Each structure stands twice: as structure tokens, then as C-alpha cells.
Swiss-Prot record:
Gene: res
Enzyme class name: transferase
GO molecular function: nucleotidyltransferase activity
SMART domains from the UniProt entry: RES (SM00953)
Functional note: Toxic component of a type II toxin-antitoxin (TA) system. Expression in E.coli inhibits cell growth. In vivo it is probably neutralized by cognate antitoxin Xre; this has not been shown upon expression in E.coli. Probably depletes intracellular NAD(+).
Protein name per UniProt: Toxin Res
Keywords assigned by UniProt, alphabetized: NAD, Nucleotidyltransferase, Toxin-antitoxin system, Transferase
Key word Hydrolase present: no
Similarity annotation: Belongs to the MbcT/ParT/Res family.
InterPro entries: RES_dom (IPR014914)
EC annotation from Swiss-Prot or TrEMBL: 2.4.2.-
Superkingdom of the organism of origin: Bacteria
Length: 145
């Protein structure tokens, strides 16, 4: 299984999740958000930025995360329409997954493109050690901004 992430840090420690809440977790829990493709990873970054192309951080890298196909995945309960406008709901579900620590990954829908799957990666799960990271430099196309 291959997942993708855009980050300035080539690690999967999830320390960002300790400092800042996300759609699927509250601050104080280590977590890594990843996408199933490089464009999906880019979309998830772009939605949070309001910058010109020349201001895109030069420290950002594309991380290719390779995992065995056999890693454990939790199952998200069925979501009702309007779920993306309910941060308390999504954070509660993500927090449960992270706190339970019974699986490495939780597939979640993208709020930007709900037919697209993203993943929460639990760095506290024992299988987290099986992840291999390759780092790629990249410069986003200026037409994206």
C-alpha cells in the first residue's frame, strides 16, 4: 500500500497533531494525515493555504509512504449527510480510533472531495514501524494558485 503526504518533515511521528486539531482529531494526539495519491495530498494542503505560488514553502516535500498490504485498518461508521460541517463528530470518531490504537490506519472521506479516501495513520500503533518513507522534492505548478 502506498500513501502520500506533503510535509516539511520526513517523519511519521505525528507531532503536528499534538499541537493543532484537525478535521479528524483534537490537539494532543499524535496523528498523520495521508492521501492515496500525490494530487490528493496536494489538494489537502492547498485548501489550507492562501498564498501566491512564489510563497509556497520551499521546505515542503512529497512523502511516499510504503506500507505492507496487510497493515490493520479500522472501519469508520457510516456518516450521515452533512458530516463535513460537524467537526465535533469527525473529531470524536478520529479520537476514538487514535485512543483505541487497535489499527494502524483509518480510511476517511475527504471533506473537499468526499468520493476520495484519505487515511489517518496512528503513529502509536505497533505496525507504524513497518512504514518506509521516500522523500521527493517538488515544485507545485503555479496554475494551482
Amino acid at each position: 500500500m502506498i500513501l502520500w503526504r506533503i510535509s516539511a518533515y520526513a517523519d511519521l511521528s505525528g507531532t503536528g497533531g499534538l499541537r493543532v486539531s484537525g478535521r479528524w482529531h483534537q490537539a494532543g494526539r499524535p496523528v498523520v494525515y495521508a492521501a492515496t495519491s500525490p494530487p490528493g495530498a496536494m489538494l489537502e494542503v492547498l485548501v489550507h493555504l492562501e498564498i501566491d505560488p512564489e510563497d509556497f514553502p520551499t521546505t515542503m516535500r512529497l512523502l511516499r509512504i510504503e506500507l505492507p498490504d496487510t497493515v490493520s485498518q479500522a472501519q469508520l461508521p457510516a456518516l450521515q449527510p452533512g458530516w463535513s460541517a460537524q467537526p465535533e463528530l469527525t473529531r470524536t470518531l478520529g479520537n476514538r480510533f487514535l485512543d483505541d490504537c487497535s489499527a494502524l490506519l483509518l480510511p476517511v472521506p475527504s471533506a473537499i472531495m468526499p468520493s476520495t479516501t484519505n487515511y489517518l495513520f496512528n503513529p502509536r500503533h505497533p505496525q507504524a514501524q513497518s512504514a518506509k518513507i521516500q522523500v521527493e522534492d517538488f515544485t507545485p505548478d503555479s496554475r494551482l494558485f
